[in-house]
Curated annotation (Swiss-Prot):
Motif window: OAR: 313-326
DNA-binding annotation, residue ranges on this chain: 140-199
Transmembrane stretches, start-end: none
Alphabetized UniProt keyword annotations: Developmental protein, DNA-binding, Homeobox, Nucleus
GO BP annotations, alphabetical order: cardiac pacemaker cell differentiation; cardiac right atrium morphogenesis; cartilage development involved in endochondral bone morphogenesis; chondrocyte development; embryonic digestive tract morphogenesis; embryonic forelimb morphogenesis; embryonic skeletal joint morphogenesis; mesenchymal cell proliferation
Gene that produces this protein: SHOX2
Family annotation (CDD domains): homeodomain
SUPFAM superfamilies on file: Homeodomain-like
Protein's cellular compartments: Nucleus
Protein's name in the database: Short stature homeobox protein 2
Family, per entry: Belongs to the paired homeobox family. Bicoid subfamily.
One of the record's GO molecular function terms: DNA-binding transcription factor activity, RNA polymerase II-specific
Protein species of origin: Homo sapiens (Human)
Length: 331
């Protein structure tokens, strides 16, 4: 009987103690997330203190004591220990901290460890751009081909035959001369360009030579403009001693053309003297222009002297004819 009374009192005291420890452990669990949110660095220490707190040890010991005692008090101890263990396993401060960190990492404004900073991206792009520029600057230099005299003679001979050889002719010529087909093709391209340049220069030279035949006639519109504007007027002051047969023929032809244009288009009559002769070509040396101007001045002086001589001779002829006529009439 005394043993039963002692056992009941002991189990009652143990039950009251377990209730107090359970209340204390519940308060610790509820205050854990708040402390973790305010003090992130101290959460792990709080979790360690909670794990090593007497409430946790009491919950484990209560479970063991309830299982060993068996009875009403023991059952209560087991239930308290199980509840304490379940609460501790479901709402651990460490797990709450981990969940809070995971939720904060999902927020759009929070920096992530996996994201690359923009500065690092810019540095990588700059480094890549510098590498690309270095590769473009370092280019392979073209090797210049030096043709022998025999190769040049063969190429020129084929170029005289045709300016555009086909692939078979280029291949045969490259095998015969020991050159690559690409070299032969490039040589023909350069040779055609050179030929076109020579033809253009020759054409320009022909035009300049044809224009130089009438260098002395370029001053005619400015010397005797009235004669060119009125080609069919036979006044004595409009007659100019011809410098040469070619100049006279050219002036007559231009006068006829100007007269025809005057009837067709009256507004072109004023511009006729300036449209008859081509303009002097550009790009001539200064020495050539000076020589041309000197020759033109000498031609003008000779024309003026010839005109004066012709006037004097015509006056003398008229006087001689007048004397003869007077003698014939008996005056």
């Amino acid at each position: 009987m005394e043993e039963l009374t002692a056992f009941v009192s002991k189990s009652f005291d143990q039950k009251v103690k377990e209730k107090k420890e359970a209340i204390t452990y519940r308060e610790v669990l509820e205050s854990g997330p708040l402390r973790g949110a305010k003090e992130p660095t101290g959460c792990t220490e709080a979790g360690r203190d909670d794990r090593s707190s007497p409430a946790v040890r009491a919950a484990g010991g209560g479970g063991g004591g309830g299982g060993g005692g068996g009875g009403g008090g023991g059952g209560g101890g087991v239930g308290g220990g199980g509840a304490g263990g379940g609460a501790g396993g479901g709402r651990s401060p460490v797990r709450e901290l981990d969940m809070g960190a995971a939720e904060r990492s999902r927020e759009p404004g929070s920096p992530r460890l996996t994201e690359v900073s923009p500065e690092l991206k810019d540095r990588k792009e700059d480094a890549k751009g510098m590498e690309d520029e270095g590769q473009t600057k370092i280019k392979q230099r073209r090797s210049r081909t030096n043709f022998t005299l025999e190769q040049l003679n063969e190429l020129e001979r084929l170029f005289d035959e045709t300016h555009y050889p086909d692939a078979f002719m280029r291949e045969e010529l490259s095998q015969r001369l020991g050159l690559s087909e690409a070299r032969v093709q490039v040589w023909f391209q350069n040779r055609r360009a050179k030929c076109r340049k020579q033809e253009n220069q020759l054409h320009k030279g022909v035009l300049i030579g044809a224009a130089s035949q009438f260098e002395a006639c370029r001053v005619a519109p400015y010397v005797n403009v009235g004669a060119l504007r009125m080609p069919f007027q036979q006044d004595s002051h409009c007659n100019v001693t011809p410098l040469s047969f070619q100049v006279q023929a050219q002036l007559q032809l231009d006068s006829a053309v100007a007269h025809a244009h005057h009837h067709l288009h009256p507004h072109l009559a004023a511009h006729a003297p300036y449209m008859m002769f081509p303009a002097p070509p550009f790009g001539l040396p200064l020495a050539t222009l000076a020589a041309d101007s000197a020759s033109a001045a000498s031609v003008v002086a000779a024309a003026a002297a010839a005109k004066t001589t012709s006037k004097n001779s015509s006056i003398a002829d008229l006087r001689l004819k007048a004397k003869k006529h007077a003698a014939a009439l008996g005056l």
